[in-house]
Amino acid sequence: MAISFKDLEKKIKSREIDTVLVALSDMQGRLVGKRVTGKAFLDYVHKETHFCNYLYTVDMDMYTVPGFKSSSWETGYGDMTVIPDHQTIKELPWLEKTALVLGDAFEHDGKTPVAHSTRQVLREAIAKANKMGFEPMLGSELEFFLFKQSYEEIHSNHYKNLKETSWYIEDYMIFQTSKEEVFNQELRNSLLDSGIYVECTKGEAAPGQQEINVVFTDALNMADNHILIKNAAKEIAYKHNKAVTFMAKYNKEVCGSS
């Protein structure tokens, strides 16, 4: 569930929570960060922590990409200051005794926002819309493929011969998605319990393709939720020895995911 800092403090002191994920989104929309002990979070990390500034300049495989002014071998790959946004604290039911808080990235001085950080880019866009008299509201409809194999199996097979969880188009098909309900039910309920207002899941237009729909909210909150939904789907799939992909087009022979 979404909880306040005071609620988190109580849960840490009572040992209901012992780990706090302090994270932000990289340029690929993935959660990156640290697992912080509850004690350290309460003592000082709730105010600030530090991440390497290369996190906004890596590729999909986490290799550093040359040519960036903000982060490079020449500049020594320094740290940026990450200040946890206490409005984003959530308890994560699918991870034992774990909470999450997203952070805003600042330069090492702790005062200047990292201009190219994902949350800052969105904050500036929202501010421009507000000046024009608009309040951006967003709702996520994520599509993804669910596979029978685990991530390890898929990797060891060099990402060939992937086996979707169903064998014919399952768009709106109840029987097809009933076979996948062990995964989808946990995903829906876990996200709902974490404070993300999930409306539904359904089959989509290809074998093994899933869709999850989330009720709209303000743009920044939805962007934060969108990242967490993807991460939760991957982690819950892993628990069930399955795998998911949100790739726009993982296979040229089947339809893509939006």
Q: Where are these predicted regions, by residue range?
A:
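ATP/Mg2+-dependent ligation/transfer catalytic cores
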Residues: M1-C200, M222, L228
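Acidic, glycine-rich loop-and-beta core segments that form the ion-binding/anion-interacting portion
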Residues: Q209, V214, M222-S258
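Active-site-proximal loop/short-helix segments
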Residues: F147-E164, Y197-T217, A248-S258
